[in-house]
Structure formats: structure tokens, C-alpha cells
């Protein structure tokens, strides 16, 4: 296994943002998204309902916009912090994600991932086997429902992007900045959506916007889930926790087909991203070329990732994720 700390030092050469390339990546994502979205709306309004079949494609472009917003949050899109922030806020209007709220939560996720004593910041709620057994029957049922794929990939993304992001949940007492971020994003999104509503009506706009957003949201949650929820994941108590170990061993390499790799902005190379989050998304493949040992480390294909949704609990004794059925056998 590569030494995580040495890798962090080696990866510094990939960290410098490339503004020209970044703006190009934004252009070839935002312009097609807007054009495709407008085309679907016009076609659907004209009665060509088959145009709605294109909403998943629009959703993929929206997902890529979120990845670019994600780079802004890490300061890896442009060289200037303020420029990163304002581009991130602009993109948040399209992704329905208040940038300042999300970027703080996501920074905490990076700082605390894999730490059993600091769970709950921008991650998928995960109990240990012992904690699950200590819960009441009602609490265990609630956790089972939460971990069900229908919740994680269906209700969860819808709740997160349609409802939770409308307010600075978790940050309500941390300053006006986060209220302005959430409410300002809401108003700006409504202002943009007012244009198609005025042109073709609320019904057609909703019929295009909702599936586009929900497809992108579900894809995003799928990516986020498999990035840290896999059999040999990394979880340690605070006294034994290591940032570098958590980054390298607690994150996967989701090896996707080239088209999906493009739409997901290479974020599947997640172990590298957690080791050095300021590497621009378009440079992550360069790291794999320079460090071939990272290719097969925690590597999963899209198909293999689906089995990870059976995992539900962290077993501290075996140091691995287990299913509810496996936990039941262990505890009797």
C-alpha cells in the first residue's frame, strides 16, 4: 500500500488550478445544459412528450455542474478564493445547492471522514453493530428505513435538494451568511425558473425541471454513497484516527466508463481527491497515470458498486462494513 503521507506530498504538483481549462470545462457543461433544457421545454410544450426522455441527459449535465461547484468549494477551480466562491454561488442557483452552506458542511466532511467520534457532517449516517443493537426496536426500524436503497436513492435526494437545501439546516445559529446563502439561492433559482414558467407555463416547466433535478440528485447520492460505503472502509475512534489513512483507505476508486467519467467529473477517483482536495477535477486522471498503484486500490466498477447498498453497519471487531443479516448472525 502506498504511504498516505508521502502521497500527499507527491500530489502537490497537481494542485495548481488552470483557469483557462476550468472556464472551458464550465462552458462545455453549462451551455449544453441550458440549450438542452430549453429544447426539452419547447418540445414538450409543442406536444412532443417524448422529449421528456432527454431529461436524464440534462440531469447528467446538471450533475457535472455540481462537480464544478464542488471544485469551487475546494478552491481548485480558479486561483482566486473570491472568484471560486462567486462562481460556486452562481452554479448553486442551477444545482439548488446554497454554496456557502454546502461548502462549510463539505469541508467538515473532509476533515472528519472515517472518524467514529465525529460523524454527522456531510456523510451517510452509519451506526456500528454495537450501537445498532443498543437502539430501541423503533430506532432500529428507522435506521433500516433510512439505509434502504429506495430512501438513499429516491426519497433522500428529493428531500435534500428540494427541501433541506432551502434553509441553512445545521447552520441556523452560525451567522447571517448562511441564511443569505440559502434564501438568496432560492430567490435566484425562482427568478431563473420564472422565464420558462412565463413562456410555457408552470406544468411544462415542472415536468422538465423536476425529473432533471431528481436524476442528477440521485446520481450524486449514488456517487457519494459508494465513495465511502464499501466493505473494507475506514472507521476509527478519534484516538486512532488518521486524516491521511482515512483519505486513502476510506475512499474508493469508482472506475466508470469514459462517458460517465466525463459527466461525473472524475470524482470517482475519490481516494486521490480526499488525499489532496485542491487538485482540479480534470487533473485527477493524471494522478493515476503518475501513480499506477492507486488504480486498483479500493477499485469498484459501476456494477460492483450496487452490492454496497446491502451494507449497513460498521463492525468494530472485524473492521469492515456488514449487512443487517451478517450483524444478526454475529449478535444472535
Place the predicted regions along the sequence by residue:
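Alpha-helical bilayer-embedded segments of polytopic membrane proteins, i.e.
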Residues: 17-65, 93-96, 143-159, 175-223
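Short, histidine-centered active-site or binding-site loop motifs used for metal coordination
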Residues: 15-18, 267
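Membrane-embedded catalytic scaffold of the fatty acid hydroxylase/desaturase
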Residues: 62-182, 232-320
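Short, Lys/Arg-rich, polar N-terminal cytosolic tail immediately upstream
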Residues: 1-16
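Cytosol-/stroma-facing membrane-proximal "stalk/adaptor" domains immediately downstream
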Residues: 157, 191, 195, 202, ...
Amino acid at each position: 500500500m502506498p504511504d498516505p503521507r508521502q502521497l500527499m506530498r507527491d500530489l502537490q504538483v497537481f494542485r495548481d488550478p488552470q483557469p483557462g481549462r476550468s472556464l472551458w470545462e464550465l462552458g462545455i457543461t453549462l451551455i449544453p445544459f441550458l440549450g438542452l433544457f430549453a429544447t426539452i421545454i419547447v418540445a414538450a410544450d409543442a406536444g412532443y412528450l417524448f422529449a421528456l426522455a432527454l431529461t436524464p441527459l440534462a440531469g447528467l449535465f446538471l450533475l457535472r455542474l455540481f462537480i464544478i461547484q464542488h471544485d469551487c468549494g475546494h478552491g481548485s477551480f480558479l486561483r482566486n478564493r473570491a472568484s471560486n466562491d462567486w462562481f460556486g454561488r452562481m452554479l448553486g442557483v442551477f444545482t439548488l445547492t446554497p454554496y456557502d452552506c454546502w461548502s462549510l458542511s463539505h469541508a467538515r466532511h473532509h476533515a472528519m471522514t472515517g472518524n467514529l467520534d465525529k460523524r454527522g457532517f456531510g456523510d451517510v449516517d452509519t451506526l456500528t453493530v454495537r450501537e445498532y443493537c443498543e437502539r430501541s426496536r423503533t430506532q432500529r426500524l428507522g435506521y433500516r428505513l433510512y439505509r434502504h436503497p429506495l430512501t438513499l436513492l429516491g426519497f433522500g435526494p428529493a428531500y435534500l435538494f428540494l427541501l433541506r437545501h432551502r434553509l441553512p439546516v445545521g447552520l441556523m445559529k452560525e451567522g447571517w451568511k448562511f441564511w443569505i446563502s440559502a434564501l438568496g439561492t432560492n430567490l435566484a433559482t425562482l427568478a431563473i425558473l420564472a422565464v420558462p414558467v412565463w413562456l410555457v407555463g408552470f406544468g411544462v416547466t415542472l415536468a422538465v425541471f423536476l425529473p432533471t433535478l431528481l436524476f442528477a440528485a440521485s446520481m450524486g447520492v449514488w456517487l457519494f454513497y459508494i465513495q465511502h460505503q464499501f466493505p473494507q472502509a475506514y472507521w476509527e475512534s478519534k484516538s486512532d484516527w488518521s486524516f491521511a489513512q482515512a483519505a486513502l483507505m476510506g475512499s474508493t476508486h469508482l472506475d466508470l466508463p469514459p462517458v460517465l467519467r466525463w459527466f461525473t467529473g472524475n470524482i470517482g477517483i475519490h481516494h486521490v481527491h480526499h488525499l489532496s482536495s485542491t487538485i482540479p477535477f480534470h487533473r485527477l486522471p493524471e494522478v493515476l497515470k503518475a501513480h499506477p498503484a492507486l488504480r486498483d486500490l479500493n477499485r469498484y466498477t459501476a456494477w460492483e458498486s450496487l452490492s454496497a447498498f446491502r451494507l449497513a453497519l460498521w463492525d468494530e471487531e472485524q473492521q469492515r462494513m456488514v449487512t443487517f443479516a451478517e450483524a444478526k448472525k454475529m449478535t444472535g
